[in-house]
Amino acid sequence: MSQPRCFMQDLIVSSSPENFSITSMGPKVRGRRAPNRETREAKRQEDLVEDEQISEPTSNLTTPFFGLVDASEIEYFKSAESTLNVTSFESTEERDAFINSVLDEASGKELKLVTNQICSKLMERIILFGGDQQLISIFKSFSNHFVSLAHHKYSSHVLETLLVRIAGLVEKELARSAEDAADQEVTVEHLFITMMQEFYPHINEMITHQYASHVLRLLILILASKKLPSALTANSTLRSKKSKIARKMIEIKDNEDFDRSFETPPSFKDELKKVCKCISENKTMKEMRELSIHKIASPVIQLVIQVEGLVDKERSVWHLVFLPESNSEDPQEEAFVEHLLSDSVGSHFFESIIKNGGARPKYIERLYKLYMKDRIMKLARRSTTGVYIVQALMFKLRPNEVEFILDEVIPELSNLVSIVDNQNIDLGRSVIDASISRSNYRRDDIISQLLSKFAPNFNPKNPSQNDNYDLLENTLLLSSSTLGNTRDDWPTAEERRNALFLEKLLDYDTSFLLAVWTSFLAMPKERFLQMCFHGVFSHVVEHALAVIPASIGESKEVNILRKRLLNVFQGSIVSLACNAYGSHIVDKLWSFTVLMKMYKERFATEMKAESHKVKESTYGRLVWKNWSMELFLRKKYDWSQLIKVQDEEYHNEGAEAETERVKRPIELKMEQLAKKNEKSSLDSTNNDERNKRQRIR
């Protein structure tokens, strides 16, 4: 048991050379932020100076210092950045005039501005809003300094945005007539290629640089005419996770040039070939494999493998990482593949080159047969590494190999997927998708495995007997979730992921749909309504309000279950309609009450009784419109006709689905056997007739 420390002990500790602070002497200072104020202020001043300088975390590149921005200039540019952020311009011309005035003030200071933390945001906004000539002017001002800017913490982001906009200008240039192109002194294509000449001597440094590697990846995408992902998406190729969060916080949004590909001239393919050559030449297999599992370089090598086939039929980079397809098993390659299958960076690299289509199918099949086929289950149990490779293989191998993987995984699916431990949830989704792609291969086994895991007490043949909500608890973990919290907690990422998984199950088979209905009925009504008002779980409720198609048919027991679920909503329609999340559920109730006009009238009557409250709410007005409540109030017959049309469409869809229904594999196989038997019987009949004729003769 530790003894309490006295004041003198604290004084001695705080007075030691490494811990000495002003708090060890003088009067006691109140508050946690008061101590070390001078030290923090000095550190802040040092950071400001460092922010102005070129950051080079992993490069030996000697970069210039472009100078500090004056305090008065910072205030002006900060004000200009705020003005652009608000976008309170009456016209595009007014905004262009404002940008021109800012660029005039920034003339000759561009390099100093883009390497400043505050002013770099202004430059990025100007590039997003700027016109063609303004972009070209900024691009020219960066000439001979592109390498330095690519290696800087702040200017690298500005450069990425500029490159995306310049790619759009290159496409515009290609669409112009020959006369318009002749009037232009220097083409944007020429400017881009000139910039590439600056980068070539430094390509190998950029591969492993914290900031320049992102610029290099963007250059490769542009040269290959590939889609340039949005800088705000979760899996963006352009930005790191921290950068995407920062852009959202400072409200910098992409324009129409992002999240699309651009047409490029033939000369860009030559430049892409040079980039691939710079990366592959003079490198040994050991060096390339080290880059493949390098935290920063790995995404670059993934991208090069994806695009090198456009300009290099020999696939030089691929064959510096893996042996040719003609080679048999190799101990060194086996050790490298094992590292890829067990390392977080390596598994991400391996998954990417399998999924993104850069490698030829025969290359992937060779690696699979040599090093993975015999231990699929072992890899599937590696929930943070190998399982992602197994998932990727399900959609890239030949059908017979996909079925082999499914045969290995499906019997153990209930043991592999764990919501509580946050393991292999994506594997469950991938198995379902792979089964569907193979004409619902072993569908019943998958359903059985997942039901036994998440709803062990549910009987699909007699769903009404279910008196618990195991399925909801086991998939959404409601007891430990933010459901019912009064602290306005935001839904967590885990809750979103679990909800999406449950929605996947609801779409897969009606057994899960009925299990969720009975779970809703087993819950206390208050708890169920909390789900309806929850930012994530409300989507599950909305998704569960699906009627079994008429082609399958709704049994009497299922019809009763649907009515019981609708009864739960009675008395809460108005509060749901006026809520941001609940309003979507009320909208969905219109289709969920098909063939049940009585429930439609009950819910409409509830909204009519509190029409003022519903109409005063933004969400309530939308529900009022979607339910055609004005017709309900003034033209009840017309409202009833809408219901009649809905019921007829439901029956018609069922009839069409019955006539156009895709036959199941077992049905096709039975038809083939029937035709085969018919043919054999016909042949035997013909043979008998021939024998009879021969006897007669």
UniProtKB/Swiss-Prot annotation:
InterPro entries named among the record's database cross-references: ARM-like, ARM-type_fold, NOP9, PUM-HD, Pumilio_RNA-bd_rpt
Keywords: Nucleus, Repeat, Ribosome biogenesis, rRNA processing
Domain of life (superkingdom): Eukaryota
Pumilio repeat copies, ranges: 105-140, 141-176, 198-234, 283-319, 332-369, 371-407, 523-557, 567-605
Broad class of the protein's primary localization: nucleus
Membrane-traversing stretches: none
The keyword Chaperone is assigned to this record: no
Homology family: Belongs to the NOP9 family.
Record-given protein name: Nucleolar protein 9
UniProt source species: Meyerozyma guilliermondii (strain ATCC 6260 / CBS 566 / DSM 6381 / JCM 1539 / NBRC 10279 / NRRL Y-324)
Lineage, highest ranks first: Eukaryota, Fungi, Dikarya, Ascomycota, Saccharomycotina
